[in-house]
């Protein structure tokens, strides 16, 4: 396993550093710095009070917490959200309430997970033809049930 250093700046007095719940977890929990109600069918930007400096050639992916989704129908709207290495602003999480009741976000609540991933840069080449493959143009359920 490759280890990187993630630099984190706390922007608010009540902000918390991201935390791994267990040693082998891929994602670290992100915490809300605000109280907010999300009505059913609505979404809201929830601020974390942190900004980060990612290691070179990495990205941060923002992913939902399974417990929020299962128990409340609340998930991250743009999943996975990508934070590029050059971004230095406050991390905000767009949560959507697919449940039937209002959802109360509370200060200090775990609202999402952040996973740090290496990135691969590719050279882009325009071509007239692509090579054949076994799958071809099949998609959207083409492999059956």
UniProtKB/Swiss-Prot annotation:
Signal peptide as annotated in the record: none
Keywords: Hydrolase, Magnesium, Metal-binding, Nucleotide metabolism
SUPFAM superfamilies: dUTPase-like (SSF51283)
Reactions listed under catalytic activity: dUTP + H2O = dUMP + diphosphate + H(+)
Names of the cofactor(s): Mg(2+)
Pathway noted in the entry: Pyrimidine metabolism; dUMP biosynthesis; dUMP from dCTP (dUTP route): step 2/2
CDD domains, per the entry: trimeric_dUTPase
EC number(s) per entry: 3.6.1.23
Molecular function via GO: dUTP diphosphatase activity; magnesium ion binding
Binding-site list for substrate: 65-67, 78, 82-84
GO biological process: one example: dUMP biosynthetic process
Domain of life: Bacteria
Task of the protein: This enzyme is involved in nucleotide metabolism: it produces dUMP, the immediate precursor of thymidine nucleotides and it decreases the intracellular concentration of dUTP so that uracil cannot be incorporated into DNA.
Protein family (similarity comment): Belongs to the dUTPase family.
Name of protein: Deoxyuridine 5'-triphosphate nucleotidohydrolase
Organism of derivation: Clostridium tetani (strain Massachusetts / E88)
């Amino acid at each position: 396993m490759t280890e990187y250093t993630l630099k984190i700046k706390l922007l608010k007095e009540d902000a918390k550093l991201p935390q791994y719940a267990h040693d082998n977890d891929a994602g670290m929990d992100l915490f809300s710095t605000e109280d907010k109600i999300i009505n059913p069918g609505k979404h809201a930007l929830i601020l974390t009070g942190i900004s980060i400096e990612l290691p070179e050639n990495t990205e941060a992916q923002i992913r939902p917490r399974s417990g929020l989704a299962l128990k409340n129908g609340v998930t991250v709207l743009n999943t996975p959200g990508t934070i590029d290495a050059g971004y230095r602003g406050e991390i905000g999480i767009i949560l959507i309430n697919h449940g039937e009741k209002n959802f109360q976000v509370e200060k200090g609540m775990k609202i999402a997970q952040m996973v740090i991933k290496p990135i691969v840069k590719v050279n882009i080449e325009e071509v007239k033809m692509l090579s054949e493959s076994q799958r071809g143009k099949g998609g959207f359920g083409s492999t059956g049930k």
